[in-house]
């Protein structure tokens, strides 16, 4: 079994492999860190490589912490009936992974988000590692696998739902029967697509 396959198998069931002990120690440090932290190398090298990561100049990885569960909605300031406040059980239309990608993009405004993957969770938070690309770096412009990100069509791609997590949330992973209202976009079909 190759090294990448070995890592992949271990992360399939982290609670039953050596990953559990590593995560227990890691998360004690992660909880004390800020929301967005740049990391030297990916925690899950197999997942990062499959999503387009390369150990070269112009490519960085950032770990982002996001809350778990439903939306933490602010309480209305003006008087309302408790029944109509709609405080609890409100779910965002955007996935937590997309929120993590957007936070990383705001922290590094000169970089574009390539992709992201999960690296752990506890009772309160989820952690994602986000791969970011510097589209103005010469080594990125000369790389055939990243060249299309430098054309200008992918500016602020994470805020337009063009990452893998964004397309999944917009329903673009489905096609055929049942996906008639998904394309070209949700708002183009009176929000009946999702």
Swiss-Prot record:
<comment type="similarity">
    <text>Belongs to the eukaryotic ribosomal protein eL15 family.</text>
</comment>
<keyword id="KW-0687">Ribonucleoprotein</keyword>
<dbReference type="GO" id="GO:0003735">
    <property type="term" value="F:structural constituent of ribosome"/>
</dbReference>
<dbReference type="InterPro" id="IPR024794">
    <property type="entry name" value="Rbsml_eL15_core_dom_sf"/>
</dbReference>
<dbReference type="Pfam" id="PF00827">
    <property type="entry name" value="Ribosomal_L15e"/>
</dbReference>
<protein>
    <recommendedName>
        <fullName>Large ribosomal subunit protein eL15</fullName>
    </recommendedName>
</protein>
<dbReference type="GO" id="GO:0002181">
    <property type="term" value="P:cytoplasmic translation"/>
</dbReference>
<keyword id="KW-0689">Ribosomal protein</keyword>
<dbReference type="InterPro" id="IPR000439">
    <property type="entry name" value="Ribosomal_eL15"/>
</dbReference>
<dbReference type="InterPro" id="IPR012678">
    <property type="entry name" value="Ribosomal_uL23/eL15/eS24_sf"/>
</dbReference>
<dbReference type="InterPro" id="IPR020925">
    <property type="entry name" value="Ribosomal_eL15_CS"/>
</dbReference>
<dbReference type="InterPro" id="IPR020926">
    <property type="entry name" value="Ribosomal_eL15_arc"/>
</dbReference>
<dbReference type="GO" id="GO:0003723">
    <property type="term" value="F:RNA binding"/>
</dbReference>
<dbReference type="GO" id="GO:0022625">
    <property type="term" value="C:cytosolic large ribosomal subunit"/>
</dbReference>
<feature type="region of interest" description="Disordered">
    <location>
        <begin position="165"/>
        <end position="194"/>
    </location>
</feature>
């Amino acid at each position: 079994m190759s090294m990448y396959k070995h890592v992949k198998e271990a992360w399939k069931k982290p609670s039953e492999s050596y990953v559990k002990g590593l995560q227990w120690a890691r998360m004690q440090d992660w909880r004390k860190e800020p929301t967005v932290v740049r990391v030297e190398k990916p925690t899950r090298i197999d997942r990062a490589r499959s999503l387009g990561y390369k150990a070269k100049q112009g490519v960085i990885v950032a770990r982002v912490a996001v809350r778990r569960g439903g939306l933490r909605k602010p309480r209305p300031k003006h008087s309302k009936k408790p029944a109509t406040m709609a405080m609890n059980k409100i779910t965002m239309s955007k996935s937590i992974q997309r929120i993590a990608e957007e936070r990383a993009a705001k922290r590094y405004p000169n970089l574009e988000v390539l992709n992201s993957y999960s690296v752990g969770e506890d009772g309160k938070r989820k952690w994602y590692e986000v791969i970011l690309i510097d589209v103005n770096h010469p080594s990125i412009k000369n790389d055939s696998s990243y060249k299309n990100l430098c054309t200008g069509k992918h500016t602020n791609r994470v805020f337009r739902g063009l990452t893998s997590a964004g397309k999944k949330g917009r329903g673009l992973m489905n096609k055929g029967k049942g996906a008639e209202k998904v394309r070209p976009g949700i708002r183009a079909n009176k929000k009946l697509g999702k």
